[in-house]
Amino acid sequence: MAYEDLIKSIESAAEEKKQEVLRNAEREVEAILREAETESSAIHAQYLEKAKRDLILENNRQKFLAKQEVKKRISAVRQKLIDDAFSRSKEKISGIRSDPSYPALYERLTREVISALAGEEIILHIDPADSKICSDVLKKTGIVCDIMQDITTIGGLSGTSADGRIRAYNTLESRMERIRDTSTLEIINLILGGPDG
């Protein structure tokens, strides 16, 4: 019996050792699983945080693009309003030659050209429709210069020095362009009631 007791004792010790190894293995597995779960949660949190950042960046990018598109459209509308305003203005002044005040305006425009080219031998460039008014203005002012009927304009004139190095544009179109170039913001304010509409 001692032999059987010895075997039972060995089997019992082996069983205990086996159970202890299994318990230790289970504890290690549980620890590994907890650690893996913690790491998984951390990785998940990192990916979630990155996804949130990416969404915020994309949202901001989309907002920026939308704002740019709105600004572009507003700018196009403003430009169209300005273009329309200048077109209407040009239409209104296209018949200025028949206005009784045109000779006085033409004289003032001529004096400005002459003044801009003071000290130079002057050539006036006029529209053939203004030849009589130009002659009358030159007679009235006593200014002597060459006249070339070589431009087409709704009104006004331009002048050059004889060598062509100096030019003075004083047509109504050139004056409107100068106004357009220097007064766009003011025009927008008048049309829309402020720089931002």
Swiss-Prot record:
Give the way it sits in the membrane. Answer: Peripheral membrane protein
Presence of the UniProt keyword Membrane in the record? yes
One of this protein's GO BP terms? proton motive force-driven plasma membrane ATP synthesis
Task: Please give the chief subcellular localization of this protein.
Answer: membrane
Where in or outside the cell?
A: Cell membrane
- Which InterPro entries has this protein been placed in? ATPase_E_C (IPR038495), ATPase_V1_Esu (IPR002842)
Q: Where does the source fall among the domains of life? A: Archaea
- Name one matching Pfam family: vATP-synt_E
Q: Name one GO cellular component term.
A: plasma membrane
Which UniProt keyword terms apply here? ATP synthesis, Cell membrane, Hydrogen ion transport, Ion transport, Membrane, Transport
Mention one GO molecular function: proton-transporting ATP synthase activity, rotational mechanism
Q: Does the keyword Aminoacyl-tRNA synthetase apply?
A: no
Read off the HAMAP family from this record: ATP_synth_E_arch
Q: What does this protein do?
A: Component of the A-type ATP synthase that produces ATP from ADP in the presence of a proton gradient across the membrane.
Subunit field text: Has multiple subunits with at least A(3), B(3), C, D, E, F, H, I and proteolipid K(x).
Q: Give the family from UniProt.
A: Belongs to the V-ATPase E subunit family.
Q: What is this protein called?
A: A-type ATP synthase subunit E 2
Taxonomy of the source species: Archaea, Methanobacteriati, Methanobacteriota, Stenosarchaea group, Methanomicrobia
